[in-house]
Amino acid sequence: MNKKTIWITGGSTGIGKALAIKFASKGWNVAISARRENLLKEISDNNENIHGFPLDVTDKLKCKEVFDQIKNKFQSVDICFFSTGTWNPKKEKDIDVEQIQDVFKVNFFGTLNSIKAVEEYFKNKKDGIITIVSSIAGYRGLPNSTGYGPSKSALNNLAESLYFDFKRY
């Protein structure tokens, strides 16, 4: 029987890293992606089941390229866990539109780029799981979260909308 494979974006820290270690301990092939190659290397060097694939999710073409590399390496992907995120806390007096746009580029559009990279694969396979990590900040305003909260709220809406689109597959 072939080992199962999971691809985790945001896999170098936080929830993504913890999940990578957990799945690897269960014998899964774990592909992790993040911008910081040194952290990917550190994690993969300490676990033979974890493999780093450097990625900036704001690059749509690179998302597809990395997913294709993962498919080629492991022959199949069973779960995609998209946990990429950035937070740039700001008080209302310090709100900078460009910084909020940068947060959206990573948190929302980076996740959307990742979904678009795997969409056809999972539709054709008719099997698999795509998980999007959000935050309580996506449901309720929190202090200093003028960019982060709205970007996660957009992810919540995206996930709910895609559920209806993808469930027929």
Enumerate the language-model features and the residues they cover.
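Active-site helix of classical SDR
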Residues: I115, S151
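Conserved glycine-rich cofactor-binding loop
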Residues: S12-T13
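Conserved glycine-rich Rossmann-like NAD(P)H-binding loop of the short-chain dehydrogenase/reductase
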Residues: K26-I43
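Substrate-binding pocket helix/loop in short-chain dehydrogenase/reductase
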Residues: K91-E92, D96-F104
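Residue(s) in the substrate-gating loop at a strand-loop-helix junction
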Residues: S135
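The beta1-alpha1 cofactor-binding region of Rossmann-like NAD(H)/NADP(H)-dependent oxidoreductases
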Residues: L55-E65, V97
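Active-site loop immediately N-terminal to the catalytic Tyr-X3-Lys motif
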Residues: K93, R140-T146
